[in-house]
């Protein structure tokens, strides 16, 4: 006699329970946890940099940079004078709730209004694991194509916000902005969409205003 155990399902269930506990902990401590996801090179770090330029003097912010290896992004972000830690995943392509909790506690979450997790660059794995975040953000860049929401459904289903980035190169790519929005809303009718260019700053103010209002509402 033997018993079959669906390991993957069990892992997800355990993580989801842990994520809900972490979300409650963040709520109790007034910490808004933002999980930023995208493919490699979509502009997570540059978008985060532009966000910090606008918000770092208006709230207490801490950043967790998750990568398989290296500390390139952490060095870039730390130059903005905010609390920054580097999380090495040891080959894993995502963070889960327990890893996120470790990062938050190491960073000293009690003194923060906004904690940002820049997840590992990947459109698949990070979407599968709830980090305990208050809100999830996906960044989709113009060069990637307007069909990505159809090809990677879960990423866009779990996100509260989608930033369509690199709008400055729109004339050079076969990218239909309205079609992209249609594809995003097909996967997630409730998604908030911003057209931005982290390089030029286009649309970043609107994004930051939304985020600041969400943080304030979370802390009430």
Predicted regions and their residues:
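Canonical P-loop GTPase G-domain recognition
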Residues: 170-220
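Cofactor-binding loop segments of dinucleotide-utilizing enzymes, especially the Rossmann-like FAD-
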Residues: 66, 141-142, 198
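Short beta->alpha connector loops at strand-helix junctions that form conserved
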Residues: 86-89, 140, 165
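Short, glycine/polar-rich helix-capping loops at beta-to-alpha or helix-loop-helix junctions
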Residues: 70-74, 148-152, 176-182
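Nucleotide-state-sensitive switch-loop elements of NTP-binding domains
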Residues: 2-24, 28-37, 42, 46, ...
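Helix-rich effector regions associated with P-loop NTPase G domains
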Residues: 110-114, 143-146, 150-154, 158-161, ...
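Conserved Switch II/interswitch segment of TRAFAC-class P-loop GTPases
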Residues: 122-125, 132-150, 160, 167-174
């Amino acid at each position: 006699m033997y018993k079959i155990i669906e390991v993957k399902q069990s892992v997800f269930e355990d993580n989801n329970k842990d994520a809900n506990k972490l979300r409650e902990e963040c709520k109790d401590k007034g910490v808004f946890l933002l999980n930023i996801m995208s493919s490699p090179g979509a502009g997570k770090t540059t978008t985060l940099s532009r966000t910090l330029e606008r918000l770092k003097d208006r709230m207490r912010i801490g950043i967790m940079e998750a990568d398989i290896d290296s500390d390139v992004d952490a060095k870039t972000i730390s130059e903005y004078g905010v609390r920054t830690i580097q999380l090495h995943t040891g080959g894993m392509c995502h963070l889960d709730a327990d890893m996120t909790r470790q990062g938050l506690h190491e960073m000293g979450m009690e003194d923060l209004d906004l904690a940002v997790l820049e997840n590992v660059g990947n459109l698949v794995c990070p979407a599968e694991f709830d980090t305990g975040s208050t809100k999830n953000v996906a960044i989709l860049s113009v060069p990637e194509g307007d069909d990505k929401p159809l090809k990677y459904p879960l990423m866009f289903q779990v996100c509260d916000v989608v930033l369509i980035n690199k709008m400055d190169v729109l004339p050079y790519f076969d990218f239909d902005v309205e079609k992209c929005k249609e594809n995003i809303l097909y996967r997630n009718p409730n998604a908030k969409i911003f057209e931005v260019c982290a390089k030029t700053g286009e649309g970043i103010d609107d994004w930051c205003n939304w985020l600041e209002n969400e943080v304030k509402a979370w802390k009430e």
